[in-house]
Amino acid sequence: MRFKRILLKLSGESLMGKQGYGIDPERLSDYARQIKEVSEMGVQIGIVIGGGNIFRGLSGSQKGFDRVKGDQMGMCATVINSLALSSALGAIGVKNRVLTAIRMEPIGEFYTKWKAIEAMEAGYVCIFSAGTGSPYFTTDTGSSLRGIEIEADVMLKGTRVDGIYTADPEKDPTATKFNDITYKEVLARGLKVMDLTAICMCQDNNLPIYVFNMDIVGNLKKVMQGEEIGTLVHN
């Protein structure tokens, strides 16, 4: 088994599937089954989901919302997605807990590092929601923070593309893929892997990132089995 403990980062937009908004039940079910497969391998799993399928704080501020209020709305969107994933996992027999960065019992338990690690070691999938609990931080940064805190072996960034390219492969047909790349090169090239704060946190704390296509069913298990289907970012 490639990694013992992982932090899986999923984008909110990915939950939309082919819809333009909200949560696609089929996509949610696909993700839940992939997570179950890996959980049954004995992998300890922490998950962070974005909220962009419902509301994005930064775009809200561009439309006239107060930035802090907008970011708080985005945090609430991540909680909605986390509850949806929790429900989908529970429906197929996967023990899980939703932990929130802001107190909102009984919707979820208030997050602490020790509570999360204890739950994962007991076989629960932990879903971390509400970002960092503070405005001005993206869910990518929240993922980096949680990955570092729970001492994950890697952050797996599930996207709709199969890794990191020299340019956006959906716009530039000449873009070429990296199988692995250093943090320094990511920063020097200005590649849009995650925001700068998130990248620097992972670099400073030696947390590697593996970017892969989560939309292809079975890919999460392939990553755990050591198949090279994405891009590894490392020091």
Language model features with spans:
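C-terminal catalytic "cap/lid" subdomain
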Residues: 1-235
